[in-house]
Amino acid sequence: FIRLREGLTRINVKVKASDEETEINGRGPIIADDELQALYAQLDALTEQDTLILAGSIPSSLPSDMYEIIMKRLANKHIRIAVDATKDLLTRVLPYKPFLIKPNNHELSEIFGRTLSTKDDLVTAAKKLQSQGAQHVLISMAGDGAILVSADGTVYTSPAPKGTLINS
């Protein structure tokens, strides 16, 4: 972990009232240059035995292409990198061949600029992202389960766990 001098971990609150859900997303911390250098030092220590997860939005004090910067920095280290991010954050890392990306079905629709409502639509979109560099694509669909398109093109589906969905 890297202790930051200013700010806290970003806090996100979801408020659910009947069938409507509202998101309140906190700003996140301010990351100073020396703290960023400490992150780079930790990243540089990773080996091919490690897996790195890049998830969520980037703090406003960092460059908007931070995920690309990290992936470029690690490109020759053969580290498995998984990315769970939205639209441009996700699509801009594809040339660096992430091991796994995890868009949800709504994010996929946003990336492709059209509603993707069937399993075939989602699998086709996942394969398009693979052609752009992603190795494995895991599509989450909240209460409808998930679809994994593996690097060899095999499609796996899983229902959502049984239970009462509180929020997504």
Role assignments for model-derived ranges:
Residues 1, 11-12, 21-23, 50-51, ...:
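Structural motif
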Residues 27-30, 87, 105-108, 161-165:
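Short, acidic/turn-prone active-site loops that include or flank metal/cofactor-
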Residues 1-3, 99-109, 156-162:
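Short hydrophobic/aromatic-enriched beta-strand-loop microsegments
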Residues 17-18, 86, 142, 151:
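Short loop/turn segments that connect beta-strands within the blades of beta-propeller domains
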